[in-house]
């Protein structure tokens, strides 16, 4: 089956979060299953074509009469990079700079989507599925119906629109409609109008043939007023078309038996290397090397969506136990300062690294005993799956993908982690104390570790589910 996959970021070339991870991995997994997949994304200013090994493509690609240059990264699922010197090439941030969105994001991502829809005719492709991701590509289903209705390259193509985070809705003043080349008729409540603004997210939800999101639990949560970000009524109307498909992880990049970022390697059958990773992590972050003390790790954005307010509130009581905490992350300045202060006040118990370091993120996953993810909401989450693979027991709030990937320990021989429901510091503290108590029971803890490491969270599993959905939309193709 031919699939055109469109995303505003694609790892490893451009990434601000989970969307980049998905766009970098899912098309490759689909290609490995025998599908013909092409990926379309902007050539952001941060991407050096020559350093990235991109090749120019000679093609007659035009968007609203304007010629568009194209680059490609060859591979099983080739990635096409759309060039626009002003809209993308001259920008540092993918969506904004200095904490503010780019003022022309509506024009930027309307351009990307139009370029993606024009690409099949220019390259001789005949995709049966257009897989469009998040608000940046939300205009795609409407544009397919109204601007490409007679395009033979897209005849019969069906659209899949994936919600990676419903909180980001692509909201713009209605006055941008003429600049986008959209008629005023789309500015209706049953189309793209959202509280007197234009919503790219709502456009995708209203016009795509099928909707997906990144975990089954999140798919249920967004149907409710509490989780639906004021789009729950539309989503309930389209509930039969909504599918929750859990994200996967890159099991090659995240493999404790081969990870180049680790000082020692290990697997479920021999955890000696994990003990060595723990000692090395303690040394690296300046904590006393004490193998008997549980290490709790966090690799997170310091924002309330991630539950960091719960961690900050629970930390003093948590430190009453004999435990070490290692945090890596950046975000809200108040939380950066709070954890830096905690590290100064408890230098033998708390280590805080403000910023991001890919290698250290891997070493925390490998060296910690437990991993805290108390998110307020979490569409899917990746770190809990990394933790399971690395034998690090997750303590999570039972929301979104966290609820789908971590089974609560039953006190005997079932479960892969520890879950809590209430969004309170006390609930986090209670779950973490449960984990610390079980840590002292080496046999029970070993069972938790081994069950977690046996979980299959690969992209192969997720790709099979997407492929099944595609075939219901375009059978026999």
Curated annotation (Swiss-Prot):
UniProt GO molecular function: alpha-1,4-glucan glucosyltransferase (ADP-glucose donor) activity; alpha-1,4-glucan glucosyltransferase (UDP-glucose donor) activity
Pfam family, one: Glyco_transf_5
Binding-site positions, ADP-alpha-D-glucose: 15
Catalyzed reactions: [(1->4)-alpha-D-glucosyl](n) + ADP-alpha-D-glucose = [(1->4)-alpha-D-glucosyl](n+1) + ADP + H(+)
GO terms under cellular component: cytosol
UniProt keyword list: Glycogen biosynthesis, Glycosyltransferase, Transferase
Pathway assigned in UniProt: Glycan biosynthesis; glycogen biosynthesis
GO process terms (BP): glycogen biosynthetic process
EC class: transferase
Gene3D superfamilies, sorted: Glycogen Phosphorylase B (3.40.50.2000)
E.C. code: 2.4.1.21
HAMAP family linked: Glycogen_synth
Family: Belongs to the glycosyltransferase 1 family. Bacterial/plant glycogen synthase subfamily.
NCBIfam families: glgA, PRK00654.1-2
Function according to Swiss-Prot or TrEMBL: Synthesizes alpha-1,4-glucan chains using ADP-glucose.
Protein name: Glycogen synthase
Gene name of this polypeptide: glgA
